[in-house]
Structure formats: structure tokens, C-alpha cells
Amino acid sequence: MQQRRKSVFASAPFAMKQAALGAGVAARRNGAPLSLAAVVFALFVFATFLYNEDIKSIADFPFGAGALRAKSPDLHVLQETVGAAHLAAGSIAKRGEEVIVRVLDAPASTAMAAAAGSSSNNSTIEVAKANANANANAADAGVKVDEGQERERDVTLPSVKEGGADEARRREDEEAAEKESSAKAAAATAALRTVVSVPDTCDLYRGNWVYDEVNAPVYKESQCEFLTEQVTCMRNGRRDDSYQKWRWQPTDCDLPRFDARLLLERLRNKRLMFVGDSLNRNQWESMVCLVQSVIPKGKKTLTKFVNGGNSNIFYAHEYNATVEFYWAPFLVESNSDNPQVHSVPDRVIQWHSIAKHAHNWLGVDYLIFNTYIWWLNTLDMKVLKGSFDQGATEYVEVDRPVAYKEVLKTWAKWVDRNIDPNRTTVFFMSMSPNHITPEAWGNYGGIKCAMETLPITNRTTSLDVGTDWRLYAGAQEVLQTFRRVPVHLVDITALSELRKDAHTSVHTLRQGKLLTPEQQSDPKTYADCIHWCLPGLPDTWNQFLYARIASAPWSSDQ
């Protein structure tokens, strides 16, 4: 057992007690009775002993507790400082920054007091004593902390990402923004899902050409990267651009202005295909330029000579829509079906054979057919006896209008049997005219369409520029024979006859090469009065298509 320590106040009375006890023993030995003084002395010694025990008790508990309580305010201050630092750190850490908090180390006496909390009773007593002395010194100094005893240390708090509440708020904000964006997109789509108004009583093809520098052209030559050199007349040296600024004005109504976004919305997840000869390719290039103007770069592509070389395909990525051209100059099979090698002097057709081409037309949502210019090479058409696949070479010559009508009958039968009218809309383009006889419009001494800069206007007599209207009549008859599938005639012939100024003339290609200056100076030989500059007349043809497509009711699957 540990020996009990004596109070400092007990040392002197203890010696006196020993002396008194010695004297008492001697007195009893002598048989002398205890005196009053001895009794008083004994009481004094007993009181002193009790006092000593109280001092021990106080030293064990109250002094230690009192010392710890005396330092508690300093610990609370430290905790509050660190807590505030953590709050500040949390705010900064949301931004992903590293946080450094400067913390003051407590004086040595405070550290001793903190350590004493986990020590034995004896250690607690020693610490309590030390803290008691420190408190006394602090009190004497006016409770002033000696800053020289404080030591600073940097505590780096870990960077943290946004907390759960902040993450939830961020997600809510993102969801709200996404909903708002979706709502705006839906509203924009709804706005595009309009139906263009074209009065049923209005004949769009009867009217006049009006010069309009404000609204024409719809696009610029330099802004359409997909134009071929065959049609870029300004780039190829043409000096006037007035041919681009004539707008067709129907007599009894207005031709709806082309809206590329509205048409693309109609074409979403759909295919539009031009089928026919180089004039339909001319119109296809126009349509590509009309729609591509509102599509950002990187979201549109053009692929040429696919499907065995017969197809060119423009793809609008965002709309999952295609604008395609399929080469079939006679619609039926012929010896001119190779789009890259088709300059065949003796053109032969297989007038009842269309399946080779037609299987490529299945599943298309808008089909635009034409066939004309390749029929004008000779007065009679050569019709194959047998088939190309079997190597047949014999043919018979048939009058052009008869052969033309027979080919259109073959085409009409296939359309009526294979096209779903609930899905596919079919158009037929009437003939695109040539301008190779300038005397027809009163330019005696002129050379074809060369140097023409104005349309034919204010005519009071009929115009004959060489169009074979017999073929036009044959097409009209065949179009009346359809039973299941309605086919819409786009009647461009008469209004296009007025545009002698709009051909490529000498500002074009010949056999894949641009005309040289020497060739351009010889329009009688090299002027192309068949095809059209772009921007130009084919843009108006496509406005007619647009008016028909955009004025139709929206189908249930759109």
C-alpha cells in the first residue's frame, strides 16, 4: 500500500505529539496523574490530525477539478476556432481548392492538463498542481495569455467535392434546364409542324417572272459547298448575276417561300429521291443547296456514285433525312444507264424492263421522276428486241412519242403495283425546255442562249422554242391512268420556256472539264442551253415541290 503523504501543516504538531507522548509515559511511570494541560494538549493534537485529513481530501479532488475547469474556456475557444475553420474550408472546398487552416497550439500547461485527463490519480494531482500554479500566475498577470508560449501549426484540410445537398441541387438545376430546353425544342418543332396554305383554286403555274433583289436568290452560290462546276456560272466567269433574282409570281396567289427548316422537319427520318436524267440531277443539286443552308457543318454529308454508281446521297444527320438522286435517264433499262459513261450515240431502250432500277425506289417517301432530254437525240427511238442481260443487240425503231408513252406506261404500272400511297408521295416533272433557237424570241443574229441576260417578258404571241409538246401530251394521258397511287404533275415547261437567260451557256463543263477561254468564245459549238445555272431556275421548281409537300396534312406517324 502506498504510504499516505503528510500535510505540510502536520510536521510541527507531529514532533510536539511525540514529545508529549514521551512525557506522558514518563509521568505514568512515576505514577503521577494526568494534568489539565496534558488533556488540552491531546485535544489539540487530535484536531490537528483531522485537519490534515481534510487537506488530503481536497488535494485529491477539488484542486484537480478546479484546475481543469480553469482551463476549459481555452479549450472551448480552440474548438470554436477549428470549427469555424472547417466551415470556411467546406465553403472553399466546394470549389475544389485545398484548404489550409492555421491553428494555435495551446501553452505547455494546457497540454499538460489535456494529457492529465487520461492519467492516473497521482498524475492528475501533479497536473492539477501545475495548472493551479499556472492559473495563479495568469490571474496575477490579469488573465493574459503569453503569446510567446503559443506555437502555430498549419493543418491542411482535404479537398472535397460538392456535398450531397449541393449535388442534389445541381441535378435538380440540370433537370430543370433540360426540361426547359425540351419544352423549347417541342415548341419549335410544333411551330415547324405547320401546314402551308395553298388555295386549291390557285394555279401555281400561271403567272409572271418578277425581278426581286430583296428575296432572291434563296441561297448564294458561294455558300453551297455541294454545287458542281457544271452549274456554278459565276465562278466559271459569268459577269452578271441578274438571272438569280427573278421570282415566279402566280397570277391568283403567292408561291410559298421556301423554308428549309420546315421542309427538313417534314423529311425527318425520311427519304426524298429524284429519279431521271441530268435535268433531275440539276434539280437535285438545287434541293441540296436549299436545305443544307440551315444545317451546321459536320452534320451533313454528300456521297456520290453509290448503288453501283447510279446514286448520289445527301444526308442531314440531325434529321436522319436524305435527299437523293438516282440516275435512270429513260426510267426503264437502256444502254445509257452508266452515269459516268453515258455519252452513247446510238441510244437503245428496253421499254418494258424497269425492275433493275425500280427496286432502288422502294421505301422512299418522296419520289420525283423525270425523263425528257435523252429522247431528243433522234426522231425515232431504238427499242431492244430481247434483253440486255441475254446479250440481245437487235432493235426496232419506234416513233418518239409512241416509245415515250409506252415507257411511261411501264413506269406507271410499276408505281401503281409497288408504291404504298399511305407512305410515298409521287411527283412527275414535265419537260425542261432548251433554248437553241434565238429567233424564236426575236433575237435574230443571236447564237443559241449565249449572252442572254433577261427572261422573255410581255409576249402577246405564242412561244415556240422547240419543246416537243407531243411528249407532254403523252405524259398527261398516262398520269390519268393511275388507280391506287396519285401522281402529282409539276408543270414547269411553259414558265421555264421564258428563262432563256438562265442556262449555263459557256460557263460550264464539257466532258468533265471547264471550257477554256477559246471554247467560251465559240458559243455556237460549246454553249450549253440545256442545263441551268445555280442558284437559278431549278430553285423555283423546288418551290413547287415544297408547296405541295408542306401543304399536305401531317401523317399520323410524323
Curated annotation (Swiss-Prot):
Span(s) of short sequence motif DXXH motif: 528-531
Any one Gene Ontology BP term: xylan acetylation
Positions with biased composition (Basic and acidic residues): 143-155, 163-182
Tissues expressed in: Expressed in leaves.
Signal peptide span: none
Location of the region described as Disordered in the Swiss-Prot/TrEMBL record: 140-184
Disulfide bonds: 202-253, 224-289, 233-533, 449-529
GO cellular component: Golgi apparatus; Golgi membrane
Residue span of motif GDS motif: 276-278
Function, in words: Xylan acetyltransferase required for 2-O- and 3-O-monoacetylation of xylosyl residues in xylan. Catalyzes the 2-O-acetylation of xylan, followed by nonenzymatic acetyl migration to the O-3 position, resulting in products that are monoacetylated at both O-2 and O-3 positions.
Family: Belongs to the PC-esterase family. TBL subfamily.
Protein name: Xylan O-acetyltransferase 6
Species: Oryza sativa subsp. japonica
